[in-house]
A protein has these predicted regions:
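N-terminal accessory segments that precede or flank the first globular/catalytic domain
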Residues: 1-74
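Activation targets extended, charge/polar-rich intrinsically disordered C-terminal tails
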Residues: 2-17, 149-212
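Residues that form generic nucleotide/phosphate-binding pockets
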Residues: 15, 41, 136-140, 192
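Alpha-helix initiation/capping motif
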Residues: 28-34, 129, 158-159, 185
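Charged, low-complexity, helix-prone segments enriched in Lys/Glu/Asp/Gln
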Residues: 32, 37, 131-134, 192
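Glycine-rich catalytic cores of cysteine/serine-nucleophile enzymes that process amide/ester linkages
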Residues: 47-121, 144-157
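General structural signal for secondary-structure boundaries
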Residues: 89, 101-104, 122-127, 185-186, ...
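Active-site nucleophile-His-acid catalytic modules used for acyl/amide transfer and hydrolysis
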Residues: 109-182
Length: 212
């Protein structure tokens, strides 16, 4: 019942979320040294968490980090955002946000804080490279619309769900410690570095730059 009430509230506030996504722009805090360090360390399949103090929509998201994205096989970033942007790759006339590919360096410079998280798999137990597979699978979702209701299983997708879906395609146990009836938030990937109990993989913080 509580989940239905929450879903209804998020649906009800969708116009407000869309408006807030467009306002709230202020100068980001990531430095050139921090961005260079990130670029040196980042690998395909890495999960990027970020925080932007100028995002009023952050009030809808629990935890410090308010956004999650995935590093692609091309070393670009694919993310699901609520911002308006030009030309939906799937050809709809009007785009109210969704999944897009952006340049890694440009993405980093827009942030106040960034955390790089890497799912590390035991290669003796896994015969495939899940990180590389996820970094390719994520392209399947490019052009999908943004999910303002934060619900699994519909035709739209939100930021941390995009990361989840890209890994879940080939790793059925990915983020299995999160209850199925709970939405996955950006900060869940951060806490997974300390709370995940799997014996065949773990989540590792590769680098973190907190400026706000």
């Amino acid at each position: 019942m509580l989940l239905k009430i929450k879903a209804f509230f998020l649906w009800l506030t969708t116009p407000l979320q869309k408006f807030l996504q467009q306002v709230g722009n202020q100068e980001a805090l990531m430095t050139s040294d921090q961005v260079d360090r990130c670029i040196q360390l980042i690998e395909p399949g890495d999960i990027l968490l970020s925080y932007e103090s100028g995002r009023p929509t952050s009030v809808f998201i629990k935890g410090y980090y308010d956004h999650a994205a995935l590093v692609t096989a091309k070393k670009s970033v694919i993310e699901a955002v609520g911002d308006y942007y030009i030309k939906n790759p799937r050809g709809t006339k009007k785009n109210f946000g969704g999944v897009r590919q952006v340049d890694l360096e440009a993405w980093l410079f827009k942030k106040d804080s960034v955390c790089i998280i890497r799912p590390v798999y035991d290669l003796d137990k896994h015969k495939v490279d899940h990180n590389k597979i996820a970094s390719r699978s994520v392209f399947f979702y490019e052009g999908l619309g943004y999910d303002y209701t934060f619900k699994f299983g519909n035709e739209t997708i939100y930021c941390s769900e995009l990361v989840y879906a890209s890994y879940k395609k080939n790793d059925s146990m990915f983020m299995h410690h999160i209850p199925e009836n709970k939405e996955i938030l950006p900060n869940d990937y951060y806490t997974a570095c300390f709370e995940s109990k799997r014996s065949d993989m773990f989540f590792q913080i590769i680098y973190e730059a907190r400026n706000g």
